[in-house]
Amino acid sequence: MIEKIWSGESPLWRLLLPLSWLYGLVSGAIRLCYKLKLKRAWRAPVPVVVVGNLTAGGNGKTPVVVWLVEQLQQRGIRVGVVSRGYGGKAESYPLLLSADTTTAQAGDEPVLIYQRTDAPVAVSPVRSDAVKAILAQHPDVQIIVTDDGLQHYRLARDVEIVVIDGVRRFGNGWWLPAGPMRERAGRLKSVDAVIVNGGVPRSGEIPMHLLPGQAVNLRTGTRCDVAQLEHVVAMAGIGHPPRFFATLKMCGVQPEKCVPLADHQSLNHADVSALVSAGQTLVMTEKDAVKCRAFAEENWWYLPVDAQLSGDEPAKLLTQLTLLASGN
C-alpha cells in the first residue's frame, strides 16, 4: 500500500499532506540553521564522505558504500565507515564492530559492510561519536565514509553522494509521509555526485547497476551459478524486495515463491525454515544472510551483488577522494 501511495497510484497521499508540510517545514528549518551557522556541525580531523539518499526505502546505497570503500582500499587509502545502525540496539554507543558483533547489536548494513570490506566500522545515533571511536582505535584512518546520514547535519562533510533508484526515482515528489522524500529533489543541485541505480540516468548522473555474483551456501561457503539451484524460494528483507526478485529472474531463476520481508526485520530459525518445504532451496539477499548465518540450514543460499558504475565520472570521483584523503 505504501508503494502505491508514494508513487501516486493511490489518492490516499492527499490525506497525508498536512503531515508532509510539517515534515518539510521542520527538515528545512534544521538544514537552514546549519547553513546559517545558527547550529554548529562537528568537523572530523579527516575528510568525511556521506553516501545517502533523498528518499526512504532501498535505493542500492549499501552496495555503493562497499564499492567506494573497496576502490579506495585498492588505491592504498585507509578507510573507516560509520552508520546509525538502524535495526540494531547496542548496550552502549558508540559501538566499534568486531568479528563477534551481531546484527541485533549493530544493524544489518554495518555488519555486511564490515564483513565485505574488513574496514573499521562504528555505529552510533550520534555519528560524530562513531567517527571519534574509529579514530581513537585506528588513528591511521585517512577518510571516513558514512553509510546514510545525508540529513544528519550535525556531522560536517566534505563530499556528498546521493544514490537514486532509477526506476522509482522520487515517486509523487512529496515529503514523508505522503511521499517518499526526506528532502526535495532540488537538493541534488548542492551534492557532489548523483548515482542512479537502474533506469535511465539523466544528464550529470552516474549510471549504476547491481551485478549479481555466484550464489553462496550459508553453511559451507560453496559457490555455484544461482540458475543451477532448483525449486527456489526467494526471500528478501530489504528496502525494495521486488528488485531482488527481478535480479533472480534476470539470472534465469523462476522462484516457486517470493517472500518480501520488512527492511531490518529480525529473523530466527523457526520463521525462516518455515518458508521452505522439503526439496526446496531458499535463496536470500546478502543482507539477510548476515542475520541467518548462525542458524542456517544446508539448503540456504544467498546471492551477493556488486555495484557497477559506468562512464568516466566514477574514476574522477575516486581521484578526487584519493587526493582528499592524501591531504592534497
Swiss-Prot record:
SUPFAM superfamilies registered for this protein in UniProt: P-loop containing nucleoside triphosphate hydrolases
Pathway(s) served: Glycolipid biosynthesis; lipid IV(A) biosynthesis; lipid IV(A) from (3R)-3-hydroxytetradecanoyl-[acyl-carrier-protein] and UDP-N-acetyl-alpha-D-glucosamine: step 6/6
Single GO term (MF): ATP binding
Catalytic reactions on record: lipid A disaccharide (E. coli) + ATP = lipid IVA (E. coli) + ADP + H(+)
Zinc keyword on record: no
Any one biological process term the GO annotation gives: lipopolysaccharide core region biosynthetic process
Keyword terms: ATP-binding, Kinase, Lipid A biosynthesis, Lipid biosynthesis, Lipid metabolism, Nucleotide-binding, Transferase
Pfam family, one: LpxK
Parts of the chain that traverse the membrane: none
EC number, UniProt record: 2.7.1.130
GO cellular component terms, semicolon-separated: membrane; plasma membrane
Chain's role: Transfers the gamma-phosphate of ATP to the 4'-position of a tetraacyldisaccharide 1-phosphate intermediate (termed DS-1-P) to form tetraacyldisaccharide 1,4'-bis-phosphate (lipid IVA).
PANTHER family recorded: TETRAACYLDISACCHARIDE 4'-KINASE, TETRAACYLDISACCHARIDE 4'-KINASE, MITOCHONDRIAL-RELATED
Protein family membership: Belongs to the LpxK family.
Record-given protein name: Tetraacyldisaccharide 4'-kinase
Organism encoding this protein: Escherichia coli (strain K12)
Lineage: Bacteria, Pseudomonadati, Pseudomonadota, Gammaproteobacteria, Enterobacterales
Gene transcribed to yield this protein: lpxK
